[in-house]
Each structure stands twice: as C-alpha cells, then as structure tokens.
Amino acid sequence: MKHFSCVVLSAMMLLTGCSSHFISDDTFRQEVTEDLSARSEILVSAGVDLDAMDMTRQEKEALEFLYAYMPLGDVVNKEPSYYLDHYRLMRKALKEMPWGKNVPEREMRHFVLPVRVNNENLDSARYVFYEELAPRIKNMSMKDAVLEVNHWCHEKAVYMPSDRRTSSPLATIKTAYGRCGEESTLLVAALRSVGIPARQVYTPRWAHTDSNHAWVEAWVDGDWYFLGACEPEPVLNLGWFNAPASRGMLMHTNVFGKYNGPEEIVRETALYTEINVIEHYAPESAAVQITVVDKDGQPVEGARVTFKIYNYSEFNSVAYKLTDAEGKTSLTAGLGDMMIHVSKDGRFGFKKVTYGKEQEVTIALEYEKGSGIAHIEMEVVPPVENAQLPDVTDEQRAENTRRMEYEDSLRNAYVATFFTAQTALEYAKKFEKKYFPDQDQRIADILVASRGNHKEITDFLHEADTKGVLSHAYQLLETLAQKDLRDTPKSVLDDHLYFGAEGECSLEHVACPRVDTELLRPYREYFQANIPSALADLVTNHTSLFVKWCKDNLTMLDAISLRYVQLDPKRVWETRLADKGSREIFFVAVCRSFNVEAWMDPVTRVVKYIDNSDMLVYDVDFDAVEQVVAPKGKLQLTYNEIPLLDDPKYEVHFSISKYVDGEFQLQNYDGSWAELFRQPREMDCGYYMLVSGSRMSGGNVFADVEFFTIEEGKTTVEELVMRDIEDQIRVIGSFDSEMKYTSVTPGAADATAVKSVLETTGRGYFAVALVDYGTEPTNHAFMDISAVKEELEAWGRPILVVFATEDDYRKFRAQDFNLPSTVHFGIDINGQMRDMIATEMKLTKGGRLPLIVMADTFNRVVFFSQGYSIGLGESLVKTSKAL
C-alpha cells in the first residue's frame, strides 16, 4: 500500500500566515457566505443568530463555514456556543502542539475543525481528550503522536460488534468497547482534539466476504497514512485489514463541506463531499465510464446510477452518481465485479460490470415496474489479494505487544468495576419479591449489559422501587436495546416511566422509548405539557388528522439532512423543522405520549399506528389525502436442498428487496427460509427482487436473481435457488471468531487465560475441534489429525482444540497423540462455544461431539464435521489446500 501526498507547497496557506480570515481564499469565502445565506430562514427558525454572538472575525467565519454545511440535526439540536467553544479549543490545540503551525488551512478546515465524524451523537469528548492527551504527546513528532493517540484509544476501548446506532466517543469509552465505526469515530475525535487532521475511511461493503469495515487516516507532515482504530501497530500504514483492503472495490470518506482536495470526488451534496480513496489501498484500480440510454438508444441526462457490491446476499448500494448531458458518469474501483443499476422516471436497467476488463459500458432503461425479467444467473468475482506491508522489526513488534498487554490491564481494571454475572444476580435478588416471578436472571442480564452505565440503571431501579413502580421500570428496561442500556441516562428513563401511559398499554408500541436508530431522549412530559389539548385530542381520537397536521405544519428539509442524525422530537415541535426520519420519529413519539400505539415496521420501515376508533392498523403516508390499510398478498418460496444447506438464512444466503421510486429496497427480515417463507407469508403488494448466492472460499459468488409481483389477495410462489458448484469450496455457515474460551497449556495446570478465538489464531483461516474425552469419535478424530501432522503443519494455520468441560481436559494426555505443533488447547466456557456452533450450523441438542470447523476470521465456515467421521484428517488437508 502507499501513502498519498495531498500538499502543493506553492498553494499552502499555513495557520501562521498573515491572513486575519478563517478562509483566506476570497472566492471560496464568498461561496460559503452564499451557501450560508441560502439557509437564513432555517437558522432563524432554529434560533441561530451568529451576529448576536461576541466573536472575532475568524471565529465568526469559522461558525459561518460550519453552519453553511452542517446537517439539520446539528443545526437544531446544539446551541451555537457549542461549536464556538470547539473552534476555540481547536485553536488552543494548534497553538500548543508542535505540529500546529504546519497544518494547512484546507486540512484544518475539513479534518480538524468539524466535531462530527460520522453519524454519532455529538458530545464534549474533545475537552476530555485534550486534557489527557496533550501532556502525553506534546514533545513527540507528528507521526509518533498519531501512534501514541491510538495506544491511548486502545487503553479505552476494544472491538465488539453492536447495532447500527453509533455511540458518541465518550459513550464508547464508558462502555470500553465499540464496533469498528465507533472505534474509528473515537480515534478521529481524539486526533482532531490535539490538532491532527484525521478522517474516517470505510469500505461500505467488502467484495470478497460479507460485512464492511471502517478505519482512520491521519495527515502527517503532508501525507495521509492509515491505521486501525484502537488496534495500535508499531508503524503507520499497517493493520489487520491490509490484505482484505487490497481486495476492496471502493474506499471512501465524507468530507465536511465543499472540498477541493486531490482525491476523486464521488459526489457533492449540500453537506459533504464524498471522496474515493481506493488508490491508497488497492495496488491496481480502474475507472469505468457508464452511459445511460433510453429504450431508443438516446443518452439520458440526470439518470441515477447506483454502484452495487454483492454483500449479505443482496446487491448493496455503495455509491450514487447522476449522468451528465451526454448520459455519462464514471467511478474508479478495484479490479472486480459490480452491479450497476440505473433509473429515471419509473424505468430502470442493470448490468454486471468487471472493472479492469471493461472501460465503457452502456446500460439502457429497458425495464419498468412489473417487467417480466427473465431468471438471471451470474458469477460475481472480487479483486485478487495483493497486500503491501511495511517493514516491522522483531523489536518493534515485541515492544508493541508489551504495550498492548499493559493497555489491556488498564482497561480491564476499569471493566472490573462493572457488574459481573454473579454480582448482578446478587443485586437482583434484593428485589426478587417485587419483580414478576422468576425475573432475577433477566434483571441480572440487564445489569451486566449496562456496562459502565450501571449506576444510571441501578439509580433508576432504586427510585422506581421507592415509588412503587419497580415492575414497570423493569418492563421499560426490557424494551431497550443493549446499547441503550449502555448510554441512556436516568433522566431519560424517568421521563418514559413516570410520564408514560397509565394502566395497560403496549410495551413495544407505547411504553418503549425507541422508534428507529435515534439517541433516546425525554419527550413525554414535554409533549403532555406543551401540546394544546385540541391537538392532543386529534392525536388520540383522530390520528389520521394528526398525520395531516404533520404534513401541513412541518417544513421538510431532507436536502440538508444526514442519515441517522435525527432531530430531537421536542425541537421538531419547537422549530417546525424536520426531515423524513425525524418526522417519523416525531409522529411516533407524540402518539406514544398520548397512549396511541405507533411504531416503525422493522421489515418495511413503514410507520404504522392503530386507530383508536376502529382498532385497525394503518400505514402512515404523509402525502396521501387519507390514511388507508395497505393491500396485502402472500409469498411462498420453494427450495430444493443442496448439500450442507437444508435451511438457507436470510441476509446470509438470500434476500428480498421491494421496488420503490426506481430503487430496490431491502426488506429487513430475520430468520431462515423455513421460518419465513416455507409457508405463505403476508407481504405488502408490490414488485420485488429475490437474490440468492453461494459464496465460495475464494470470495466469488454464484448468484441467482428472480423478479416477481405480489398481488392483493393472491399467493405468489417462487423458487429459492442456491447454486452448488462442485469443484469449488462453498461457504456453508458462520463461526463467531470473537467467541471466548479458557486457554490452557497441557502440563501447566494453572496457566489459564480467557481469550477470544481471534486472539489465538490471528487473522486468516483456522480450525476448531470441540471435543470430549475418551470417546471413540474423539479419539478417532485425534488419530486422523495426527496422521496428517506434517501436512497440517505445512498449512501453517492454528488448530484450536477446545474441550467441552474442564474435567475432559484434566483427563486428556497430549502425549497419547502426535498432534501438529500448530495445535492450541482450551476449555469451553459453560458450553457457550458448543451452543454457538450448534446454532450457526443448525444442529439439534448441541450436535454430536467432536464438532470440527474450518473457518476464517471473517466468520465464514468452509468445512464442518460432527461425530464419528472416517478420513477427517484427509478432509481437513484437502480443504486447506483448496483455500
């Protein structure tokens, strides 16, 4: 991989220059002024008056730049003083840090000043971070400072998957872990707090496997370098993702405001400039020019071109562009396959494109809703791996490992203050006669899940106990997602408990504080006190008229909204400003505040409510003259089983998307074919696309695409096709490589440690054998593996032997077998690994030991065996050679 220079010295404007303007370029400053002026009415409605604030010229221009481009949620939810204080903190950091005088104006403006990194909740993290970090790095070089800040982040948090709502940096630290998007948000915030330009980079979807990833680039002395957030390495441009990133199709970042850097611009919006940095990671990439034509072959201007990567069994949209007057647009990507979807005025077309082989592609708008498109089969091939790794000495690696172990100890000391399973159960038993019967364990689970937020939860429960509503408090907590338990303050919970509906109500559709992915906020007391009685009556008794009220009274500003940055429902009421998502949340929040059942459907993401007059469920359509019950039909999928796949999983093996406004939108089901579609399932009427795919061990996918229509009152029957390619190794399941187990060393009875599989195996392929002691199937497995010892050692990847119980391990004698030197030993923790394998591989009663899995750290299983199996060793060798 390479770093990328972004500095043209002749044009550089250093912060120590003589300009008294925040933006030295007169033309760009005028453009910002014009863009801010276009928002003047919005700022007035939001109560923002920059002229009334006591600021210097540079401070005012900085805030004008921010307010010209910040998303609606940030305009409305935060006071101007919040952004002014952060500007002043930035100036302090640039003045006090030795590299501050060398940061160019452009990089300062776009990659240091903005508080927002992605779609996280904004907080005051920068103040906390600066106080901790400044003394620690003030005498370092800029490059060493970047590495040191990442070590500091590792002290605070490690990786753990979670839901799509992005925690604030302080919430991530409070929890002591976060998913990659949260870790990278934390690191960017930390780097910016000390005046180092930083940006979050992400591949929206991997091409060779499911999921995605986010990391960080930091600007150091004129170049951009990358690093894995909270995963410190001895040098920059190194992370576990070097190899997979070399197989990436697209890497991009959203730059705040209008940006004129050297990178390829994917698109410009009213808020940000999306840039493509694939060339930093993929040694080879190429551009493809797309021409969109109508059914007569004429170029189409303004057609929407969507670039899609196969991931999680759907063609996931990763970039959008519009065609020019000649019907053309282009995108640079890694050398693999993408699906290109084009649409305009109710017509669409699509084509698989191979980057590196095709330079110009023409796609016609040849289809429309309901088109009888033929069954389509295709192979989708990702780029080949071509990683470039920087040199790291043994001494550097050893020192980095030593530091990481120390940082783990600091973080673990903090985590030790959280509830454990035992202490949480002891706490819950104090109230055992006040909860519903036998709820001790569930309350204990809530306390463990609250992590560093446990005091907010226990204070909430204590007060509820004193007020005689403990059981209701428990029910409220049961409606929350785990992330809500980790970052929701008591004040928010109090609002939803004490101002919730009296008497019996729907927990899910009235009592629950959550609507979509928003940060939980208090609003019930406010709405009950501030919404006039006449409107409250409308909400309660004529809900369809409240839908109309929302349409007539709220100014919609989707053009300046950012996904997942929703407005506080109270501020929607106060300002009468909203975007689509915020209006939906506001509608549901107001309904629930007045005991009307309302919710967002988890599959279709359509807002629904139950009308108290007829108790029917209505879909909310803010543009309709009247609200109606949506027409329904049914879908049944037939499936002819292929080897090792008797029940395909949704969003692993297949997915369904509905055609809406020219695009196919994923329907968010959870389950398997047998659970969802073996029998006819009710669905909204409409035009749909069914995508299924068999992922091979090399990352390529053999996909099948079907189109169908659901008609009112009718059952549509379609075949779910899973292609089986006999001469290639297929991904057959999932294995959680973050699964914990007790690591042991034979002959050293006391040398134990709790580790994840990933910690033991490192990135790449591995094998796991979950075994008991002394049974014939397990002994045969050990002998089969011993028989191919040399071949498995030549493979070089770790083999983890995990005993089902400690007693099994104590009886085991390693000297009885000639196992490969690559074998590691461990003990399953309370059967958790066995349960996980049984669940993922659809086994009954935990499966038959031994359970043998070969997988990789993208959690893809390519080999599985259970119980007695002849030739196990040869099968493992054969599979390993084919990978």
Residue ranges and their predicted role:
Residues 311-333, 660-678:
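Short, acidic Ser/Thr/Gly-rich low-complexity loop/linker segments typical of extracellular
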Residues 221, 326-340, 344-347, 353-359, ...:
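Short Pro-Gly-centered beta-turn/loop motif in secreted/extracellular proteins
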Residues 813-849:
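Short, internal strand/loop/helix patches
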Residues 24-178, 211, 396-400, 404-575, ...:
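Secondary-structure boundary elements
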Residues 276-284, 288-302, 312, 636-651, ...:
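Structural motif
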Residues 847-866:
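A short, hydrophobic beta-strand/beta-hairpin element that forms part of a small beta-sheet core
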Residues 756-785, 798-802:
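Short active-site neighborhood of thiol/selenol oxidoreductases, capturing the structured segment around
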Residues 22, 135-141, 145-151, 160-170, ...:
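Hydrophobic/aromatic-rich core segments of domains that either
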